[in-house]
Regions:
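C-terminal substrate-binding/catalytic lobe of Rossmann-fold NAD(P)-dependent oxidoreductases
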Residues: 4, 8-65, 144-268
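Structural detector of well-ordered beta-strand residues that form the stable sheet scaffold
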Residues: 25, 53, 94, 118-120
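Short, ordered loop/turn segments at secondary-structure junctions
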Residues: 30, 98-100, 124-125, 155-157
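Glycine/charged-rich beta-loop-alpha catalytic/anionic-binding loops adjacent to active sites
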Residues: 67, 113-122, 222-229
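N-terminal Rossmann-like NAD(P) cofactor-binding module of classical short-chain dehydrogenase/reductase
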Residues: 70-71
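Rossmann-fold NAD(P)-binding glycine/threonine-rich loop
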Residues: 77-89, 96-121, 130-138
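Rossmann-like NAD(P)H-binding beta-loop-alpha module
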Residues: 130-147, 163
């Protein structure tokens, strides 16, 4: 197994892989203060004899170590570069990177299909969030013609770079699809100025503060009452559990899958 991106999630994934005796083939990260160091020591577990390599070493690491799955929690541009090498090498992927533009995500999916590899792609690997999405979808189906306003509020730690979160955007896409619209037609990112709420719009709001791991709330409100569907991640362990399940799921498969597929396969 190959880890692409050694930030907070990358380190947590490595810890769990060590605990489950996964064979870790390599770690790739561009940070100069990490390159050359032992990945296990950096993650706070034990010395593994696996040095962190620069992205330009990815091809060599693949040729030397021959991983069967690559897990990418980097950033959109890095993920696109990584996927080109990984896909051409015939290695399956688990991709939790967020912040893709529509065209970038389309390019990524085309690359996976063209090279006939398998990939689980999800902006959130948490089992709870994927159930949250199903609950939101069902609620919107029941209420979409009953004069309910829909707002999404997400909160994360001060270090998160993309806003709104990939999870919030995916939530909005699910809602828009149920309403038979394109998200671009309905999305209202934050609010300012002096005007009433537009009928049918989906409000999307982002909070960045402290060390919040991840919170997502959907409000469905009408005159006289309100429903709230909420998911709160207490720690990154919620995401890591899903990543491990996705790694097990994607081995030997071809095509593009979501965490819903992983959950329905009984692996999460």
């Amino acid at each position: 197994m190959l880890i692409l991106g050694f930030g907070r999630m990358g380190k947590e994934i490595l810890k769990e892989c060590v605990a489950q005796n996964f064979n870790i083939c390599g770690v790739i990260d561009p940070a100069e203060d990490l390159v050359g160091k032992d990945a296990g020591l950096v993650a706070g577990v034990k010395e593994l004899g696996i040095k962190i390599n620069k992205p330009k070493e990815l091809g060599r690491v693949i040729n030397d170590r021959k991983p069967d799955v690559a897990v990418d929690f980097s950033n959109p541009s890095a993920c696109l570069e990584n996927s080109e090498i990984v896909a051409k090498s015939g290695i399956n992927m688990v991709i939790g990177t967020t912040g893709f533009k529509a065209k970038e995500l389309e390019t990524l999916k085309e690359r996976i299909l063209e090279n006939e590899i398998g990939a689980v792609i999800s902006p959130n690997m948490s089992i709870g969030v994927n159930v949250f999405w199903e609950l939101v979808e069902e609620a919107v189906k029941l209420l979409k013609d009953r004069d309910y306003d829909i707002e999404i509020v997400e909160a994360h730690h001060r270090f998160k770079k993309d806003a709104p979160s990939g999870t919030a955007l995916r939530t909005a896409e699910i809602i828009a699809k149920v309403m038979g619209k394109n998200l671009k037609e309905l999305a209202a990112y934050g609010r300012e100025g002096f005007h009433e709420r537009k009928k049918g719009e989906i409000g999307i709001h982002a909070i960045r503060a402290g060390d919040i791991v991840g919170e997502h709330r959907v409000l469905l409100s009408t005159i006289g009452e309100r429903i709230e569907i909420t998911h709160i991640a207490h720690s990154r362990a919620a995401f890591v559990k899903g990543v491990i399940a996705a790694i097990k799921f994607i081995k030997g498969k071809k095509g593009i899958y979501s965490m819903r597929d992983v959950i329905r396969a009984g692996l999460a």
